[in-house]
C-alpha cells in the first residue's frame, strides 16, 4: 500500500471555505463545494477517520527512511569526489592497509588495530617494545631508537588528525542530510497542509494589527521622542544657566552701584565741631520738653486733688469763675432740609490747627440743592437706593409696636414696671453704692 493511495482513501476534508481542491481516483484535481456543518462540542467531525492512522504513518516513515538510506551513498560519493580531505584520507587508509598486510606477514599472531586514542597508544607502546627488543638484539644505538620513536609519535599524531578530519566531514555530511531531510519534511508537511482541514479565519481589529512597517515606525517614533526629550532637557539647562548668569550680573552691578554711591559721598566738608554743637542743642530741647510734660502732669494731678477736696458750693463757684477752655470750639450751624450730618471727631481737638477750625455743618455735594420742592415720596434719604429710609422724620411718626411683649398689659409686666423698671416708679431717692435687699 503506497502513500498516495493511502492519502486518497481518506475521506474528503470539510472546510469553512466555499470550495476546496480535491484529488479524485484518476489523479485529477477539481474544485468541489463544501457544505459547512455546525460544530458540536464532543462530537467527532465528519472529516475525521474512524480508525487510527498509525499504520499509515509507520509505513510512510519506513518508506522515507529507505529513501534516505538510498540517497546517502550518492551523497557520500559526491562528497568524496569533491572533498580533497576525503581523498587524502582514502589514500592514507590504503597505505595503512598495505602496512598492516606487511606486518601480518612478519608477525605470526594477528593484531587488532583500533581507532580510539587508547588503542593507538597501546599499539605505539607494543611497537616500541618490539623495536626495543629488536634493537637490543641487533645492538642499535640510542639515536636510532629516538628517531624511530619520534616517527611513531608523528605517525600516531597524523592518524589522530586524519580521524578528526573524518569526523568533521561526517558532521558536515550529517548536517547536509539533516537540512535536506528538513527540506523534504517541509515539502511533505506543505503537501500535508494542503490536505489538512482549513481553519476558520479569525478577524483582528485594525487597531490591533501590527505589521513590520508599523513596528519600525513605532520604534522610529520612540527614538524621535527620546531625542526631543534630550533636546528639551538641554534647552532647559541652557535657560537655567542663562538665568543664573543674568542674576549674577545683576548682583555684581548692584554692588558696583552701591560702592559707587558710597564713593560719591563727600565727607571732606563735614565739621565735627558743628555736628556736636547741633546734637547738644537737640538734646537740651528734648530734656526741656520732657521736663515740661512732667511738670504739667504733676500740676494736673494737684488740680484734680484740689477739686476733689472742695465742697459742692465751692466747686460750682470755681467752675463759674474758671470755665473750661476749648481750643477749637465749633459754632453750631444750621442744617438744611435732609442734609447729611458729619461728625468732626473728638480726638486731637486741643491742637491749634486750621483743619480743626473749619465749619463741619456746611452743605456738600447734593446737599446744596433744595429738597423741599421734591415730591413727598422723594423726600427721604438715599432715594432710589438700597439704603433709603422709610420715613422723612420720626417726629411725626409713631413707631410704637403694640403687638410686642413689653407693650402688653399683663400681671408680669405690671409687677416688673412697679418693682424693677427704671424711670417709672414713684421713688426719687438717690441710689446707694450697696445693693439693697428687696423682700
UniProtKB/Swiss-Prot annotation:
Places the protein is found: Nucleus
Q: Where is this cross-link: Glycyl lysine isopeptide (Lys-Gly) (interchain with G-Cter in SUMO2)?
A: 67, 249, 357, 371, 381, 415, 418
Q: Where is this region: Disordered?
A: 1-200
**Where do Basic and acidic residues bias regions lie?**
23-34, 61-70, 145-163
Positions of modified residues (Phosphoserine): 52-53, 94, 116, 118, 132-133, 361, 432
Give the Phosphothreonine positions (modified residues): 267
- Composition bias, kind Acidic residues: at what positions? 71-81, 112-122, 131-144, 178-195
Q: What does this protein do?
A: Involved in pre-mRNA splicing as a component of the spliceosome.
| The family this protein is said to belong to | Belongs to the MFAP1 family.
Its quaternary organisation is: Component of the spliceosome B complex. Interacts with PRPF38A (via N-terminal interaction domain).
Its protein name is Microfibrillar-associated protein 1A
Gene encoding the protein: Mfap1a
Amino acid at each position: 500500500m503506497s502513500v498516495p493511495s493511502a492519502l486518497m482513501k481518506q475521506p474528503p476534508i470539510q472546510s469553512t471555505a466555499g470550495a476546496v481542491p480535491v484529488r479524485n481516483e484518476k489523479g485529477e484535481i477539481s474544485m468541489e463545494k463544501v457544505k459547512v456543518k455546525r460544530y458540536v462540542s464532543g462530537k467527532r467531525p465528519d472529516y475525521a477517520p474512524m480508525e487510527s492512522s498509525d499504520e499509515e504513518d509507520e509505513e510512510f516513515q519506513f518508506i522515507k527512511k529507505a529513501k534516505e538510506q538510498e540517497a546517502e551513498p550518492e551523497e557520500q560519493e559526491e562528497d568524496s569526489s569533491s572533498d580533497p580531505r576525503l581523498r587524502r584520507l582514502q589514500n592514507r587508509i590504503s597505505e595503512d592497509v598495505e602496512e598492516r598486510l606487511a606486518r601480518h606477514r612478519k608477525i605470526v599472531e594477528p593484531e587488532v588495530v583500533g581507532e580510539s586514542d587508547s588503542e593507538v597508544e597501546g599499539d605505539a607502546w607494543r611497537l616500541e617494545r618490539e623495536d626495543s627488543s629488536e634493537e637490543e638484539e641487533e645492538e642499535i644505538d640510542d639515536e636510532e631508537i629516538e628517531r624511530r620513536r619520534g616517527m611513531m609519535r608523528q605517525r600516531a599524531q597524523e592518524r589522530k588528525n586524519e580521524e578528526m578530519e573524518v569526523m568533521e566531514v561526517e558532521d558536515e555530511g550529517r548536517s547536509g542530510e539533516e537540512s535536506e531531510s528538513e527540506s523534504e519534511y517541509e515539502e511533505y508537511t506543505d503537501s500535508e497542509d494542503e490536505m489538512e482541514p482549513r481553519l476558520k479565519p479569525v478577524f483582528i481589529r485594525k487597531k490591533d494589527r501590527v505589521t513590520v512597517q508599523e513596528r519600525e515606525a513605532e520604534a522610529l517614533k520612540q527614538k524621535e521622542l527620546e531625542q526631543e526629550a534630550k533636546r528639551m532637557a538641554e534647552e532647559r539647562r541652557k535657560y537655567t544657566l542663562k538665568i543664573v548668569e543674568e542674576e549674577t550680573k545683576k548682583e555684581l552691578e548692584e554692588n558696583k552701584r552701591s560702592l559707587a554711591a558710597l564713593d560719591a559721598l563727600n565727607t571732606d566738608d563735614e565739621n565735627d565741631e558743628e555736628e556736636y554743637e547741633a546734637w547738644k542743642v537737640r538734646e537740651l530741647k528734648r530734656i526741656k520738653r520732657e521736663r515740661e510734660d512732667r511738670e504739667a502732669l504733676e500740676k494736673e494731678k494737684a488740680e484734680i486733688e484740689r477739686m476733689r477736696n472742695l465742697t459742692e458750693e465751692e466747686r460750682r463757684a470755681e467752675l463759674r469763675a474758671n470755665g473750661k477752655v476749648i481750643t477749637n470750639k465749633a459754632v453750631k450751624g444750621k442744617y438744611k432740609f435732609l442734609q447729611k450730618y458729619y461728625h468732626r471727631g473728638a480726638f486731637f481737638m486741643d491742637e491749634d490747627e486750621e483743619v480743626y477750625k473749619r465749619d463741619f455743618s456746611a452743605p456738600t455735594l447734593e446737599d446744596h440743592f433744595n429738597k423741599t420742592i421734591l415730591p413727598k415720596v422723594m423726600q427721604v434719604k438715599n432715594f432710589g437706593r438700597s439704603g433709603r429710609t422709610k420715613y422723612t422724620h420720626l417726629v411725626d411718626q409713631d413707631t410704637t409696636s403694640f403687638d410686642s411683649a413689653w407693650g402688653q398689659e399683663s400681671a408680669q409686666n405690671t409687677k416688673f414696671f412697679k418693682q424693677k423698671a427704671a424711670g417709672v416708679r414713684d421713688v426719687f431717692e438717690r441710689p446707694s453704692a450697696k445693693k439693697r435687699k428687696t423682700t
